[in-house]
């Protein structure tokens, strides 16, 4: 099924809030087998003809409308009703939820909130306890129209239930395989798999990317031998970029590997300013059981003082170099006695982040150079993920590609 997402949000357009909700919705749709054809961010007050944002016909489609404000609700509702020829009606569920919210506060109901009591006749609805914008799905012919609030709490609470209604009569996939990769963009992956994606065996291959962290989902609606052949080909072509063979994050993958092997790791960070360890602890506080020590280095003096690195090494090669991170990592693993060491140093200038990542044990430490061209926060995030990726590959297979210097 094809999907289009329309987010009506002045706040996102003005840069007052992030578009995390859009990312969450698109990833959720993708994981359930939807193909996302378009994502648009529009102002709260939609001035375009409604037909302009319901463009495609003749296929089974899902239109998702994420609303930031109550003023958008009647506009979208009226547009859907006019397009489908359905009348508006007051929903008892919406009426009860909205009226109880204002009666409990002992304040009159605004007109914008009263308008949110209306839904298309015959629509499926779920009462939203967090805001006046209700969760509504209308099914007409080949199309589904989903309206809901853009709030993260509402989306996390109600989206899955609404999509379950949409998919309840759809053919279910009987075979499914997921691969998680790092290091290739969505466009790069689609180029590598182009001939497999355009197949005649009705094997669905979809790619969803968050920067360089990607998810490839292979599906089939019937049991067939060809499915395993496609899985094998995808794995063969992307093997060196794959860090998991299920729909889990890097942090979840790393935790499974460390806990299963009962290994501890020590970290040394400069350019990432502690972001690596912070991302792990935020994802799962249980990581504390497997993190032996952490070092965050602010400058060259700090490196020398904390882990006894030679001043001459930094003077000769600089704060960010293969030699420096190798010596830093060697000293860390010797001083802490951890099973694994993981270190990163780097520099950021003119939206170019150059870093050196060291991963290894007492037998061998290997250093990898990464270059990311992006704004600071995005570059640090990519450097953090690249570091975790190398660590995962070390723990999984010890299959480093020593001739590769950039991700």
For the regions a language model picked out, list residue spans one by one.
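Short alpha-helical segments enriched in small residues
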Residues: 46, 225-226, 231-407
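Glycine-rich beta-strand-to-loop/alpha-helix junction loops that act as flexible
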Residues: 8-10, 60-74, 221, 344-346
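Proline/glycine-rich low-complexity loops and linkers
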Residues: 48-54, 58, 71-166
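Accessory alpha-helical/coil subdomains and C-terminal extensions
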Residues: 140-212, 219, 226-227
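Gly/Ser/Thr-rich loops at beta-strand to alpha-helix junctions
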Residues: 11-19, 67-73, 150-154, 212, ...
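Glycine-rich phosphate/diphosphate-binding loop of Rossmann-like nucleotide-binding domains
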Residues: 1-41
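Glycine-rich oxoanion-binding loops at beta->alpha junctions
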Residues: 26, 30-52, 90-133, 301-339
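Conserved hydrophobic helix-helix packing surfaces used for dimerization/oligomerization
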Residues: 3-5, 145, 265
């Amino acid at each position: 099924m094809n999907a289009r997402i329309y987010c009506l949000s002045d706040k996102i357009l003005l840069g007052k809030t992030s578009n995390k909700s859009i990312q969450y919705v698109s990833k959720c749709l993708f994981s359930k087998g939807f193909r996302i054809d378009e994502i648009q961010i529009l102002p709260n007050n939609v001035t375009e003809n409604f037909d302009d944002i319901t463009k495609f016909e003749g296929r089974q489609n899902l239109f998702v409308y994420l609303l930031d404000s109550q003023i958008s609700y009647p506009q979208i509702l009226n547009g859907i009703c006019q397009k489908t020829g359905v009348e508006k009606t007051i929903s008892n569920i919406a009426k009860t939820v909205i009226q109880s919210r204002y009666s409990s506060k002992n304040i009159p109901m605004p007109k914008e909130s009263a308008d949110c009591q209306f839904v298309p006749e015959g629509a499926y609805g779920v009462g939203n306890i967090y805001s006046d914008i209700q969760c509504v799905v209308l099914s007409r012919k080949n199309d589904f129209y989903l309206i809901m609030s853009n709030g993260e709490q509402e989306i996390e609470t109600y989206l899955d239930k609404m999509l379950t209604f949409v998919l309840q009569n759809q053919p279910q996939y009987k075979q499914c395989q997921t691969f998680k990769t790092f290091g290739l963009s969505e466009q790069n992956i689609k180029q590598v798999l182009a001939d497999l994606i355009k197949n005649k065996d009705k094997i669905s291959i979809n790619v969803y990317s968050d920067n360089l962290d990607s998810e490839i989902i292979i599906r089939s609606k019937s049991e067939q031998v060809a499915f395993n052949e496609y899985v094998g080909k995808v794995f063969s072509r992307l093997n060196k970029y794959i860090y998991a063979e299920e729909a889990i994050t890097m942090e979840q993958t790393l935790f499974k590997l460390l806990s299963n092997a009962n290994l501890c790791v020590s970290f040394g960070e400069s350019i990432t300013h502690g972001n690596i360890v912070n991302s792990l602890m935020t994802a799962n506080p249980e990581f504390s059981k497997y993190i032996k020590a952490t070092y965050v280095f602010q400058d060259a003096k700090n490196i020398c003082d904390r882990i006894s690195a030679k001043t001459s090494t930094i003077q000769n090669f600089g704060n960010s170099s293969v030699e420096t991170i190798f010596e830093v990592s060697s000293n860390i693993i010797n001083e802490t006695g951890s099973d694994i060491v993981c270190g990163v140093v780097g520099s950021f200038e003119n939206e170019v982040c150059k870093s050196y990542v060291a991963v290894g044990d007492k037998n061998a430490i290997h250093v990898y150079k990464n270059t990311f061209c992006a704004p600071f926060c995005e570059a640090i995030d990519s450097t953090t993920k690249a570091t975790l990726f190398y660590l995962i590959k070390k723990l999984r297979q010890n299959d480093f590609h020593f001739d590769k210097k950039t991700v």
